[in-house]
Each structure stands twice: as structure tokens, then as C-alpha cells.
Amino acid sequence: MLLIKELPTMKKILFSLVVLAAMMTGVRPVQACTSVIVSGHVTKDGRPLIFKNRDTSTLHNLTIVVQGSRYRYIGLVNAEDTTPINVWGGHNEAGFGIINTAAYNLNGDGGDTDGDGILIRKALELCATLEDFERLLDTMNKPREVNSNFAVLDAQGGCAYYETGNYDYVKFDVNDPNVAPEGYLMRTNFGTTGNHKLDQGVERYCAITDFMAEACKEGNLEHDYLITSISRYLKHGVTKLDMYDFMPESENDTQYFPFGDYIARYSTASVILVQGVRPDESPLNTVSWTIIGWPLTTVAIPLVLTSSGKLPAIVTDDGTGHSWLNEKGLKLKQRIFSLEAGNTTSYGDLSQLFNKQGTGILQQIQPVEGEVIARGEEAIAQLRKNSKNIKTIESYYDWVDAYLKKHYRALF
């Protein structure tokens, strides 16, 4: 067990502050997501990106394909809501993608609303462009029952945040250098146009600011890096304490650490990154890169709309009302969050996540994930060359199902 006296003086002070803050902080909003948008002007392939690390009390997530009133779409949903009423991110056949983070300061009362997931579903059903989304916002009955930073992209290269409350919204165009000088923007749980006395998620905003500055400096504003790295960034935004600096000797060297104010927390349920298309490409080449489950125990899989509506079986309802991959990830997560008394439930055992012997859960799934991503990139490249290569995607989905079941069973 990690002892405070074993730490260097400054690290000991900072560690104590993090633990004290974790113990004293009141109830945090559970809908506490972290997001990023990136202009196609700064990605190497010219395709825009929108990313969301989803926090929620509903930890059972999965993906679905739905024929909406106008467009068919891939959606990230709660496992019990596959009809669905609410969708929490995805893209449609017109190349329109959308995600959100709750912004608790936009309506002036600091409260939450019930319409954010409904609006995402309607947008996926009806919208092809940013202008369509703006018309949807303009024509909604008011109050809209929303308080979100909606991130939207389209097949024409459009990409923007919309800080949206019950009566107003403000657009932040990531393609405008006056708005986004480095070609990217970030949001957590406050709007920049809201009442800053009600801001939430400031510590995660500091963390994602640090992460993106470094990614930009290193030329890593790319889909594969962001989907595999943001939710595994374990450096505190305020104290700068990095969990990797507390690397346990082995999986038996139990070291509990408070996860409450990090990007990935106990309440993180899934991750989605929508990779748009260039204006000269088919909207059907839009990709939703998803991590269904806790992102430190599950892996990223690219999802593309097919004519059959097929997706990998392990990220859809497996007949039990849950996703196979999500459930595997939750079981592994229990090994990390093994404490059950009071506020200790937010403390994770780092030795189960990573250690100097390389036997941590995250360390074991990363090579597996690397192969899933590499094979996925190959299949998507074939689709981009010829839209008739959709069978390549479906074959890839079959391979993913078999490959991940084999390796999760062998490893764990």
C-alpha cells in the first residue's frame, strides 16, 4: 500500500491535497463529460473531428443503427433505451455528426435539463449540415429544455460548438482562426457565454487544455491518437499530479488513488470520436470511433454505416439487454474500484490498471486495441477507395467480434 511518507516532499503535499479535495468536495454532476473539436484544416488527412468522454450514472452503454424520420444513423445510447428516446452521440448517412457536454451555467440556475439527448436524436434524424442544425434550434419550442455545448460536424467540412440554453445559442466555429487560432476547441461542463459562478468541470477543462496543447505541439491532432489517449490522460488539471508517476511495483502492490477530478472517472461510461469526411468524399465514409465501456478497460472500435445496418455484435445488444464488450469492461473495472464504503468508491487501485511488471489491465488491452485499430484503418481505406467495398467493413466487424472475445478470454 502506498504510504504518504514514502513520497518526495512536494509530491507528498500535492498528493495530500488531491486526497483532501476528493474527500471534501460535494456531490459532482454525474453528467460531466469532456469534449474536443478539431478542424479539418489542422488534421493530417483534412477530416474534422469531434470527441466526447461520456460521464453518466448509466454505465451500461451500447450502439445502435436507427432509421430516423429522414436519415439513418449510428447512435451511442443507454442500454435500456434502444428505441431510442435519447442519443448521446453519433453520425448519420448524410455525414452529419453530433455530441454534447452538459453546460450547467447556461440557463442561470445551475440545474440540469431533460432534452439534450432528445435534441441529439432529432438532429441525427433530420440534419445534414450545420445550417440544418441551426434551423432546428431556431424552430424548437422554447424553453428548449437543454443546457449543452453541442459539437457538430458535417460533410462539407463544417465543425463548430453551439453553446445552447433554453432560449439562446452561440456558435463557435473551429474553422475560424479568430475563434480557434490552433484549429481546436474544448468544452467540459460550462459554457464560455454562461454565468461563470456556476461553472462545473473546471479541473477537467484545465486537464484537457494541457493535453491538447501538448498534442498540438507534437503534431498529434489525429483521430487515432485522440481516441486512445484523451480518456487515458491521468494527469490532474490543477495539481498536475500524474498517476503514472505513482507506478506500482506489481499487481500485488495495492495503491489507491482518487479518480474523481480526472478526465476518466468512475462515472465514465463510454467514449466517441466522430471522424468526418473531406468535401470531395462520400458522407457514408464518416466514422464513429467508439469505446463502449470504461475506457481504461475496453478498446476503441471504428463504426461505419452499412446498407445492412450491421455493427460488431459485441457493441450492440447481445440479447441480454447489454453489450458484451461493455459488460467485460465493467467486470474488469470492478477489480480497480474494489472499495465499497462511502466516498471510497471513487478510489481506484492503480496496481490493477498498470504496474512495472506490465500486467495491468490497461497495459494488456493496449496491444489488442492496436491491432483492432490497424485492421479497422485498412478496412476503412478500402471503403474510401470504392464504396462497393462495404463487405470489407462487414467482414471486419466479424473479425473484431471473434478477435476481442478470444483475447479478453485469454487475458482475463
Residue ranges and their predicted role:
Residues A22-V30:
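C-terminal segment of classical bacterial N-terminal signal peptides
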